């Protein structure tokens, strides 16, 4: 074990994954980080393998994907692993963010960790969108056309930006080439950002815990206790992912994407992948194109205001009943937005979308600070009454 403490590289690994002291009371909700790292490794390995057989051209992109599925040894497995792990990646990220919101992981001294996490999330969305375009089925082509066209909402220079992104006057070879190049390189940028996320956590105060208090009173080394704990969820994740990959590989996809891209025929409904539906619903709920685009981006960036709008005195909401109610309303509203994103743009879905959008933004800028102030006032009143009773007796 001495070499782990003396060798410069091994000493670094030792401080992060062997001797790193963790609060003894952290639950399985703190296992999402290791699961996300595992997902990223799967995505990079399967993605690089798929890139060896993919041809980023308008004429051959769809055929090269079919070639991977039919002719490459275990190509179907690699592709389905890549597609379904992408969904699992976002699902676990949403759970990870939900846990962060519940337990106040955004509060000082972990504000930098939260900020880096939001940047990682934005980059994940960009990477997922670029990858969705590559198979060049109907949904790929029209999804790329619709989403890149959002840039045209920018006054004066919008259309020029769209044509710059396309490399022409419509989605063409240049578009697929640049999307492929970016989709290939961004996961490595994600890996670097994930490392920065980990360093920021390590150098601030380490992991939080379910009580929201300092974990310095009782800590355990990462190995073997938390390595074993992480392995349990990793093996459960492999089991769950295998069920999707082997028994229902296309359940989260769109059948329209098995039709070769046709610029002359628009699909009945242009719908993104399920994990982007809430933001798509926010985009569509605002009639003005520019305001819709701003709202969609703001829906992600607004996560950065949480360290400033949460005025509660305790970290997390586990002991704050009013904040708990607001939190669960927010989760329900987010799921409603996800459902509305898959619906046609017609009444009553438009009206429901507008109500849900207002509630979504209200949670961050109105509900959280207001509920925090009410709870602080109730605590102060209770303390005042307690002190008054003590003085009486």
Curated annotation (Swiss-Prot):
Cellular component terms per the entry's GO annotation: mitochondrial inner membrane; respiratory chain complex III
Annotated residues for binding of heme b b566: 96, 197
Keyword annotations from UniProtKB, A to Z: Electron transport, Heme, Iron, Membrane, Metal-binding, Mitochondrion, Mitochondrion inner membrane, Respiratory chain, Transmembrane, Transmembrane helix, Transport, Ubiquinone
Keyword Membrane annotated: yes
Membrane topology: Multi-pass membrane protein
GO molecular function: metal ion binding; ubiquinol-cytochrome-c reductase activity
One GO BP: mitochondrial electron transport, ubiquinol to cytochrome c
Binding note for cofactor: Binds 2 heme b groups non-covalently.
InterPro entries in alphabetical order: Cyt_b/b6_C, Cyt_b/b6_C_sf, Cyt_b/b6_N, Cytb/b6-like_sf, Cytochrome_b, Cytochrome_b_C_euk/bac, Cytochrome_b_N_euk/bac, Di-haem_cyt_TM
Transmembrane segments: 32-52, 76-98, 113-133, 179-199, 226-246, 290-310, 322-342, 349-369
UniProt entry tagged with the keyword Oxidoreductase: no
Misc note: Heme 1 (or BL or b562) is low-potential and absorbs at about 562 nm, and heme 2 (or BH or b566) is high-potential and absorbs at about 566 nm.
Assembly and binders: Fungal cytochrome b-c1 complex contains 10 subunits; 3 respiratory subunits, 2 core proteins and 5 low-molecular weight proteins. Cytochrome b-c1 complex is a homodimer.
Known role: Component of the ubiquinol-cytochrome c reductase complex (complex III or cytochrome b-c1 complex) that is part of the mitochondrial respiratory chain. The b-c1 complex mediates electron transfer from ubiquinol to cytochrome c. Contributes to the generation of a proton gradient across the mitochondrial membrane that is then used for ATP synthesis.
Family classification: Belongs to the cytochrome b family.
PANTHER family listed in its UniProt record: CYTOCHROME B
Protein name per the record: Cytochrome b
